[in-house]
Swiss-Prot record:
It is an enzyme of class 1 (oxidoreductase). The FAD cofactor is bound via a bicovalent 6-S-cysteinyl, 8alpha-N1-histidyl FAD linkage. GO terms for molecular function: FAD binding; oxidoreductase activity. Binds 1 FAD per subunit in a bicovalent manner. There is a cross-link at H110-C174 (6-(S-cysteinyl)-8alpha-(pros-histidyl)-FAD (His-Cys)). It comes from Arabidopsis thaliana. Belongs to the oxygen-dependent FAD-linked oxidoreductase family. One of its GO terms (cellular component) is vacuole. The lineage of its organism: Eukaryota, Viridiplantae, Streptophyta, Embryophyta, Tracheophyta. Gene3D superfamilies: 3.30.465.10, 3.40.462.20, Uridine Diphospho-n-acetylenolpyruvylglucosamine Reductase, domain 2. Its main location: secreted. This is Berberine bridge enzyme-like 12. InterPro entries: BBE, FAD-bd_PCMH, FAD-bd_PCMH-like_sf, FAD-bd_PCMH_sub1, FAD-bd_PCMH_sub2, Oxid_FAD_bind_N.
Length: 533
């Protein structure tokens, strides 16, 4: 709540910011930008957008995915920079640093708590939506792609599919998520157990540092390359592009869904799922969704299982009969399809034969919703009585849910310090979720209160010392930082939860590559205090 208070406080400041002040910031920035680049005045008007620009509001709102931050009271950037080429990004960094202005970096806008486009201080937004070039090369080893960080996952999947139906990339199932944030925060999807995290397939990158210089993997050196794979790129620079290795998948994969009520032994299914899902064939990913009975107005929890199997339906039905009879999987529950179609199915398109893959190219969702998310990691199976208490409480909390994502498989064979992402050797991850339709502080207090209730209920059953969180499920409840004199101490509070023991190395890298802490946000990696450098 501390950051929300700051944001509303800042909103009054933002709205009272005199037009003279706003004009001065714009004029100073433009003069610097023109000095650093060779941009024409015509191009400049499309790249550097002041609040008075007709393109300012549509550009800002286009990639705000959480409606909580798409209101008139939220603080707005003084300028939005929409770069077209690398030199525009370099100029944005140089000029923002010269003028001591905070620079927010936005690729897809899916930061759950809005830190890529909202701040309590005067700030600029660097919108990378034009950086969406993707080059797929199937002749490079087993296949690779260079993808700019403003591209979406859907665009990446589509460009791979254009070249091959048996090549894929292991990342998220939401097609409008931006590559930049997803990859730099770790990244995962429905092939995580087979192929590991998204960052495990990153082999090169280009980044603009705090001095406006561009580096690839060789010139940035391995410490920085390590940090931007799971540590969040926005703490260290502006990542322009990633080179990723592709994976091969069968021509035919299988998806299935099983829904159960409490009367249909949903509790038994979820209990057994904890033992099977993290230990079964790595080619099988089974996600469980638990939700309060908002829609059907019953008094029981809705329990849904959604799955992808990298193989044929007959094989997974036989496997589940042996390992997971509580699921009750039947052949008629399964659908065989191509990998690209499985992504459409995961988008809730039931009849994938009637949906064209081009839908993956759509960048904007139908509408942004009001939402809040939190995360947890589970290291030991919950007992049936413990699950039963969760079910009973969840049934009373409107619009609240939990998404359980199994780990195991490839995640267990990689060291926790191989990349900056530390949460590998877990049973499963929980996403705590609440989404609501209505604006206003009363609705926000009610529904976020419900979410925090489920989060508190889970306290005894999840990781401890610290209670771990997933960076890409941004959660300002676990701590925020104004980067003052005690910035390191504040950063350590949320930093240990996101990064565990890897936090120490991340701080050392940050201090080395950005000693002035130019690249910062309310949950960025802090620098070491002067007396510890």
């Amino acid at each position: 709540m501390y950051l929300i208070f700051l944001l509303f406080f800042a909103a009054s400041y933002s709205m009272s910011l005199s037009s003279a002040d706003s004009v001065t910031i714009y004029e100073d920035f433009v003069q610097c930008f023109k000095n650093v680049t060779t941009i024409s005045d015509i191009d400049l008007s499309d790249v550097v957008l002041p609040r008075t620009s007709i393109s300012f509001t549509p550009t800002l709102r286009a990639y705000i995915r959480n409606a909580r931050f798409n209101t008139s009271s939220m603080p707005k950037p003084s300028i939005i920079i929409v770069p077209r080429v690398d030199s525009h990004v370099q100029a944005a960094v140089i000029c923002a640093k010269t003028l001591n202005l905070q620079l927010k970096i936005r690729s897809g806008g899916h930061d759950y708590d809005g830190l890529s486009y909202v701040s309590a201080v005067t700030f600029l937004v660097l919108d990378l939506s034009n950086f969406r070039n993707i080059t797929v090369d199937l002749n490079d080893g087993g296949g690779s792609a260079w993808v700019q960080t403003g591209a979406t996952l859907g665009e990446l999947y589509y460009r791979i599919w254009e070249k091959s139906e048996v090549h894929a990339f292991p990342a998220g199932v939401c097609p409008t998520v931006g590559v930049g944030g997803h990859v730099s925060g770790g990244g995962y999807g429905h092939m995580i157990r087979k192929f590991g995290l998204t960052i495990d397939h990153v082999v090169d990158a280009t980044i603009v540092d705090a001095n406006g210089q561009i580096h690839d993997r060789k010139s940035m050196e391995e410490d920085l390359f390590w940090a931007i794979r799971g540590g969040g790129g926005g703490s260290f620079g502006v990542v322009l592009a990633f080179k990723v290795k592709l994976v091969t998948v069968p021509k035919t994969v299988t998806v299935f869904r099983v829904d159960k009520s409490v009367d249909e032994n949903a509790l038994d299914m979820v209990y057994k799922w904890q033992f099977v899902a993290p230990r079964t064939d790595p080619g099988l990913f089974m996600r469980v969704l638990l939700s309060s009975p908002t829609q059907n107005k019953t008094s029981t929890v809705n329990t849904k299982l959604r799955a992808l199997y990298l193989g044929k339906a007959d094989d997974v039905v036989l496997k589940m009969a042996e390992e997971f009879p509580e699921l009750g999987l039947k052949k008629e529950d399964c659908k065989e399809m191509t990998w690209i179609q499985s992504l459409l199915w995961w988008m809730n398109h039931v009849d994938v034969d009637k949906v064209k893959p081009e839908i993956l190219l759509e960048r904007e969702p139908d509408s942004a919703k009001f939402l809040k998310r939190k995360s947890d990691y589970v290291e030991k199976e919950m007992t049936k009585p413990e699950l039963n208490r969760l079910f009973q409480k969840l049934a009373t909390l409107d619009r609240t849910g939990l998404v359980l994502n199994p780990y195991g498989g490839s995640l267990n064979v990689t060291a926790v310090n191989a990349t900056a992402f530390p949460h590998r050797h877990k049973l499963y991850k929980i996403q705590h979720s609440v989404t609501w339709p209505d604006a206003g502080p009363e609705a926000e207090r009610l529904y976020i209160g419900n979410l925090r209730t489920t989060y508190n209920i889970m306290t005894p059953f999840v990781s401890k010392n610290p209670r771990s969180s997933y960076l890409n499920y941004r959660d300002i409840d676990i701590g925020v930082n104004d980067h003052g004199a005690d910035g390191y101490r504040k950063g350590e509070i949320y930093g240990r939860k996101y990064f565990g023991e890897n936090f120490d190395r991340l701080v050392r890298v940050k201090t080395a590559v950005d000693p002035d802490n130019f690249f910062r946000n309310e949950q960025s990696i802090p620098t070491l205090p002067p007396n510890r450098r």
